[in-house]
Regions:
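Extracellular glycan-modifying ectodomains
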Residues: 1-388
Length: 388
């Protein structure tokens, strides 16, 4: 049974029954009546912005920060009208078809797009140079943008050329050798795998992929690794999934729709996300007990390490777990949330763990959108300041 589609149909039908188009006028009148009593009239004549890009909602929120404790209720009403009448959320959110939400930094060039791309390229060259100086090998896993996997859910939204080129920029950065001694960099592009999954690849209300997508990507990535890196010790242990019932999940993009309690039912339907846990099989547990003496004398060895973003760091998606299961080995996870792909890698390369015991292979997960978003120049400047 497709739980996500079932929940979507249920909530869509429910909204159509509870909130028909004939009620829009009533809602608008109620909202204006409520807010008129809470804000001085003179404040309404200084509101600047555009309904359709969320600026009015943000402006009302700022007024309530200063004027009245009923801010959450008022802003929730404004957000509801903006979403239901205009199909828009707060600034930073794009509302697609059938309740699909997208973050605008994936759809629109940043203020300094070209400079951020150049900074990303330089950071990549720095990382490549580090690996050229040691025996560890690097494998890049490119995560496609959400819009690229489900473009049909964008509606009439057009993608700017700079945005469409981000994936090519990233792939090209690892195919070019700009320094003497740089080794070939293995690249796994997850686009085909995720495109095959269609709407099951990404969560509708979140920027991230689904647990089903991480399993599929990890399986195909593991096949590629086994073919390219034949000397690694695979299948040293065995894992299995303990699966539970799906849970209702409201993703991070709900933050751009501050409907508040009581109004969420009129917003996009939440996702249903698979819940599971990776555990050792009974055979693996028995084997670990028998090998305890060898581990004590020889120490632990982890031939593969993972570095990346919240796509790998957040345990809700289970990417690191899926890789461990597919490769049959424990994989230390150095991914971090909220830092993009470059900062965690630079920190890992100077860590005691990497310097004293470099692994045979490092998997570096990079979402394509980070080639142009704000922040790459800052990471590069901080790196340069530490080197000087």
């Amino acid at each position: 049974m497709d739980y996500r589609n079932g929940l979507r149909r249920f909530n869509t039908d429910r909204r159509s029954r509870l909130f028909p188009s004939s009620a829009f006028g009533f809602l608008l009148a109620l909202m204006l009546f409520s807010l008129a009593g809470l804000l001085p009239w003179k404040q309404w004549f200084v509101l600047e912005g555009n309904w359709k890009n969320g600026e009015i909602t943000s402006a009302v929120g700022k007024l309530y920060d200063k004027e009245h404790p009923a801010r959450n209720y008022a802003v929730g009403l404004w957000a509801l009208v903006s979403y239901t009448l205009f199909g828009e959320g707060q600034k930073g959110l794009f509302v697609g078809k059938d309740g699909w939400l997208f973050i605008k930094e994936e759809l629109e060039p940043s203020a300094h797009e070209h400079q951020e791309v150049e900074a990303a390229r330089e950071l990549i060259e720095i990382v490549k140079s580090h690996f050229a100086e040691n025996e560890s090998q690097l494998l890049i896993t490119v995560i496609p943008a959400k819009w690229r996997v489900v473009p049909e859910n964008l509606g009439e939204k057009e993608i700017a050329p700079d945005i469409a080129l981000r994936r090519s920029y990233l792939l090209d950065a690892f195919s070019n050798k700009q320094a003497v001694g740089q080794q070939d960099i293995a690249v796994f592009d997850a686009y085909e795998t995720m495109r095959d999954l269609g709407e099951k690849a990404f969560l509708r209300t979140d920027t991230h992929w689904t647990p089903q997508a991480t399993e599929s990507v990890a399986e195909r990535l593991s096949q590629s690794i086994r073919q390219q890196f034949t000397d690694l010790s695979y299948d040293q242990t065995s894992f299995e999934w303990q699966r539970s019932d799906p849970e209702i999940f409201r993703g991070d993009l709900y933050n751009f729709l501050p409907l508040g309690r009581g109004l969420e039912m009129f917003g996009p339907s939440p996702d249903l996300i698979e819940t599971k846990q990776l555990v050792l099989t009974h055979e693996a547990i028995n084997g670990a007990i028998n090998n305890t003496e060898n581990i004590l004398f020889d120490g632990l060895s982890f031939p593969v390490n993972l570095v990346g973003t919240s796509y790998s760091a957040n345990e809700r998606w289970h990417f690191a777990d899926a890789l461990q299961k597919s490769l049959g080995m424990e994989i230390p996870n150095h991914a971090q949330e909220g830092k993009g792909p470059f900062q965690p890698m630079l920190e890992y390369l100077v860590s005691e763990e990497f310097i004293e015991s470099p692994p045979e292979l490092v998997i570096w997960e990079i979402p394509e959108r980070y080639m142009g978003v704000e922040g790459n120049q800052k990471v590069l400047e901080e790196y340069r300041s530490k080197q000087s």
